[in-house]
Amino acid sequence: MKNSCVLVTGATKGIGWAVSQRLADQGCHVVGLARHVADIDFPGYLYACDLANAGETEELLRVIREKYPVDAVVNCVGPAMPEPLGEVDLASLYQAFDLNVRVAVQAVQAFVPGMRARKSGRIVNLCGRVVHGQAGHTSYAAAKSALLGCTRTWALELAPYGVTVNAVSPGPVETGLFRAECPVGSDAEKTVLATIPMGRLAQADEVAAAVVFLLGDGAAFITGQEIGVDGGGSLAGR
């Protein structure tokens, strides 16, 4: 895994940041994409990109493909978008699929030709406990479920080329975004913790550990799988 070149989307916050740090610590060359890059001490090569803009995304991926021999792609972008069923509108539904699925498709399409040629590669998609169902998250659950379907489909398609494709599905994670919605000690936090058998939030670095494992040599024969990092929150009967 050392000296591998890994592209990470959503690389400057939360899980994407933790993944980038872990990869750099293991000697990987990290290429990060994020909307805001000013004043960030990133452990690799960082590029500004509005991933909501398909044209801008495609052009930057072309530039990166010509500059770096990307061995692996980690799709981290895709913020949670809670809304009750009665409040779902087409704009939010399309936005969820755009950020969670279209961006991943573009990123993978850009670098799969090189992986096929080298007969080696890794793709990890960040999905979430939401793929097992979560009230009030229609658009987000649908988009992440679609990404999980892509994961399994790509795994079958790329296995003959030695490329593995897997998903990591975290439950609630201790991030600034989470705390903005669920302050420590709030009723909102208590409601979330009640859904986690282990009684605490995941740390971003714990999720990153699962991602980095799937990128490593020890996971060379694992493909098409979903690893939950959710403290038991996706288990039936919880």
Regions inferred by a protein language model and the residue ranges of each:
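Conserved glycine-rich cofactor-binding loop
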Residues: 12-13
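Conserved NAD(P)H cofactor-binding loop of Rossmann-fold oxidoreductase domains
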Residues: 76-82, 232
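Substrate-binding pocket helix/loop in short-chain dehydrogenase/reductase
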Residues: 84-85, 92-97, 188, 192
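Catalytic loop of short-chain dehydrogenase/reductase
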Residues: 124-146, 151-160, 172
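Short, small/polar-rich loop/turn modules that mediate ligand/substrate recognition or access, typified
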Residues: 159, 164, 222-224
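A conserved structural motif in NAD(P)-dependent oxidoreductases
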Residues: 196-207
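Short C-terminal tail/terminal secondary-structure segment
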Residues: 212, 223-238
